[in-house]
Amino acid sequence: CRTRVNVRSSHHCALTPIFLMIRRPPRSTLFPYTTLFRSVQSIRALKMLGSNISMPNKTVVHKYLDEVDEAAKLCGAINTVVNLRDENGQVTGKLKGYNTDGMGYWQALTEEGIDFKGMKMVLIGTGGAATAIAVRGALDGVAEIEIFNIKDKFYSRGEEIVDLINKNTNCKATMNDLADKDLLKEKMHAADLFCDATGVGMHPLEDLSNIPDPSFFKKDLIVTDTVYAPRETVMMKQAKEAGCEKVFNGMGMMLFQALIAIKLYTGKDTPVDYMKEKLGI
C-alpha cells in the first residue's frame, strides 16, 4: 500500500501528531480484513494500542472483547477498542471497548467553561451519537433529559435508552414525539441545554431545521448541534436570531472524541491548541 506521512514535532507537545493516509490493500492479500473477528484478533497479534470502530461494527464488536466500558454497554455501541496495558506499560492482549462520542460532546462543553451537572436537557435524535450523548450525560450528572424523535424505526430504540437511563442512573429521562411541537417548545423553554444530534442541517438537508422558528429558543439556552459541515446550520442561525449567545457546532465533539481515544491508546495528551488551529475552531 502507499502511505503519506506528515509529522509535526514540538517540545511543547506530549505527543507528536502523525497523520497517515493508507490505501488499503485488496481483501485477498495477507492482512485479514475478511471478518471482524480476525480484525480484532489482529489487534492482539500485532500488539496494536487499539483501533477505532465504524458502522456497522459498532454494535457487534463487543462479542470479541474482554471488557466493555459502562457507558458503551448502556448505549450498545463501541467506537474505540483499547489494548490494555500492564503495570510495565506493555500491552496485554486484553481488549476493552469504549464509546468516546458521548465523552467528546461533554468534554467540548467543559472546555467552553460549561458545568452541565444538574442541568435539564432537550435532545433530538435516537441514533448512535444521540444515544452516546444521553448515556454519558446521565452518568456524569445531567439531571433530566427530554429526548424527541419522529416515530420511525429508531423511536423504540429511544424508549429502550430512556428505560436504561432511568434504571441505571440518577437522571430522569423521557421519550417524546418530535411531531408534538407544542411540547417541544415547552420543554425547550424549561431546559438549560439543547442538542440536535440528527443529520438535519448537513448535506443534503442543509436547508432544513428540526426547529420551526426562533421562538422555540430562550436567550439563556445553551444550543449545540452535532453537525460540523456546514459550520453553521439553519438551527444554529435560528438560535442566534433568538438571542442565544452560547451556540456550538459539532467540531468540538469531533475533536475531543478523537483526543480522548488517543489518550486511551497512549496514555498521553495531544496538543489540543494545535489541533484546534488546524480544524479552525
Describe the predicted segments one by one:
Residues 221-222, 226-281:
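Adenosine-phosphate binding glycine-rich loop
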Residues 1, 21-25, 29-36:
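Short, small-residue-biased leader/transition segments that mark boundaries at the very start
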Residues 139-144, 242-245:
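Conserved S-adenosyl-L-methionine
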Residues 99-102, 118-138:
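Glycine-rich adenosine-cofactor-binding loop
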Residues 142-169:
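NAD(P)-binding Rossmann-fold cofactor-contacting core
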Residues 171-247:
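Rossmann-like adenosine-cofactor binding region
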Residues 8, 32-112:
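Phosphate/diphosphate ligand-binding glycine-rich loop within oxidoreductases
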